[in-house]
Amino acid sequence: MYEYFKGIISKITAKYIVLEVNSIGYILHVANPYAYSGQLHQEAKVYVHQVVREDAELLYGFATEEEKQLFLSLISVSGIGPVSALAIIAADDNAGLVQAIEQKNITYLTKFPKIGKKTAQQMVLDLEGKVVAAGSPAESKAPVQTADNQELEEAMEAMLALGYKAAELKKIKKFFEGTTDTAENYIKSALKMLVK
């Protein structure tokens, strides 16, 4: 088993990043690959978890040790696999997730991707009182109010009309939040990120 890899991020796609360690490129499936865009071609430390299946060996990557622990807690729940766990983490609401589990808020939990009522109930049963530490870093973050960025909204709507998936665009939009640019430049930058 591996704890983390330290290497150069050589590639970013919509679903994974490639981390080059000692001339070997490892595919790491991560919750939000575009969050690593600022580190492209730079050294990064990524926490990892290996999943061995009959047909594949997969590596999942995490920005922090806490994020990795949350992932491990989620996949311990019956009905939640690695892909679903990553989708939940990608929603970027770890504090809300932990709070909903502690308060047994089934309705809130079903708002997360791929989580139905039965799985939400299982999450409460299995994780209540166990995931506070994993969620605490997210809880400590002060909420940031971002002003409406009309240019960014226009760019995302245009790309949606071009046929790009909403899930991919959501990740890209999150990366650009807090910046100011023209819709045209946002589209150009987003296209570069999508083709890498």
UniProtKB/Swiss-Prot annotation:
Pfam families to which the protein is assigned, alphabetical: HHH_5, RuvA_C, RuvA_N
Compartments (UniProt record): Cytoplasm
Entries under InterPro entries matching the protein: DNA_helicase_Holl-junc_RuvA_I (IPR013849), Hlx-hairpin-Hlx_DNA-bd_motif (IPR003583), NA-bd_OB-fold (IPR012340), RuvA (IPR000085), RuvA_2-like (IPR010994), RuvA_C (IPR011114), RuvA_C_sf (IPR036267)
Region (Domain II): 64-142
Region Domain III, annotated ranges: 147-196
DNA damage keyword on record: yes
Presence of keyword Lyase: no
Gene Ontology MF term list: ATP binding; four-way junction DNA binding; four-way junction helicase activity
Transmembrane spans: none
Sequence segments annotated as region (Domain I): 1-63
Cellular component GO terms, alphabetical: cytoplasm; Holliday junction helicase complex; Holliday junction resolvase complex
Domain notes: Has three domains with a flexible linker between the domains II and III and assumes an 'L' shape. Domain III is highly mobile and contacts RuvB.
NCBIfam families per the UniProt record, alphabetical: ruvA (TIGR00084)
Subunit structure: Homotetramer. Forms an RuvA(8)-RuvB(12)-Holliday junction (HJ) complex. HJ DNA is sandwiched between 2 RuvA tetramers; dsDNA enters through RuvA and exits via RuvB. An RuvB hexamer assembles on each DNA strand where it exits the tetramer. Each RuvB hexamer is contacted by two RuvA subunits (via domain III) on 2 adjacent RuvB subunits; this complex drives branch migration. In the full resolvosome a probable DNA-RuvA(4)-RuvB(12)-RuvC(2) complex forms which resolves the HJ.
The protein's name in its UniProt record: Holliday junction branch migration complex subunit RuvA
